[in-house]
């Protein structure tokens, strides 16, 4: 198998689609966040899936940006960098949640509950160290990066514009999460997830069309031609 830029870009598109599907999947029947849930296998599986979602999203937006560097300009670069940093931080937070929190929940349940409170837009009763600024920066970079990157993709007119607009609006709407109960907060993931699926499919299809269109066709000589 020959690895080409087209192959890599199509893979990035599929990564974005997978990220969107995972983002929706981890929200389905999500239990209430509390110390008891942290001790379960389901917690580890869900947090690991969220970390994988962040990695796939990063791969996906990287492919989207590289496909349209010139068209998105400075705004695209800024949006990609900020959004990418956001996903890197989200990945780190989810890995910490999957590995560290279950290990300390019995010895320091108060700390774990404070971390969970901050993760859902609430306030910590005690000191949670670097987890406080880490969650804060993750929130700002996710919201700001998604908005800027979505606008840049919309203006570039290369990928599906409806999905680009939905990415900008969906990520920005996440700022309202602290205003809703945990059960309703899960709904805010759907617009961004659908946007990733739409953009990823658009990137994959666009590369597939370009690849098919470059196949050279040599006309046959008419029968009996001398």
For each feature predicted by the language model, list its residue ranges:
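Hydrophobic, aromatic-enriched alpha-helical segments typical of multi-pass transmembrane helices
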Residues: 2-226
């Amino acid at each position: 198998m020959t690895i080409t830029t087209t192959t890599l870009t199509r893979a990035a598109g599929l990564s974005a689609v997978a990220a969107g599907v995972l983002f929706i999947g981890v929200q389905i029947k999500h239990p209430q966040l509390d110390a008891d849930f942290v001790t379960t296998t389901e917690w580890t599986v869900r947090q690991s899936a969220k970390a994988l979602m962040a990695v796939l999203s990063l791969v996906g937006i990287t492919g989207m940006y590289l496909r349209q560097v010139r068209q998105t300009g400075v705004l695209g670069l800024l949006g990609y960098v900020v959004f990418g940093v956001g996903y890197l931080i989200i990945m780190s937070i989810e890995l910490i949640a999957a590995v560290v929190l279950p290990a300390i929940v019995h010895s320091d349940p108060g700390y774990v509950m404070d971390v969970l409170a901050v993760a859902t837009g609430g306030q910590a009763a005690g000191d949670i160290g670097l987890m406080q600024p880490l969650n804060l920066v993750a929130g700002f970079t996710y919201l700001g990066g998604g908005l800027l990157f979505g606008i840049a993709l919309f203006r570039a007119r290369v990928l599906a514009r409806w999905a680009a607009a939905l990415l900008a609006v969906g990520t920005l709407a996440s700022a309202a999460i602290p205003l809703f109960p945990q059960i309703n907060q899960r709904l805010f993931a759907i617009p961004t997830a659908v946007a990733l699926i739409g953009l990823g499919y658009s990137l994959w299809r666009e590369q597939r069309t370009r690849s098919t269109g470059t196949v050279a066709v040599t006309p046959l000589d008419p029968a009996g031609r001398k």
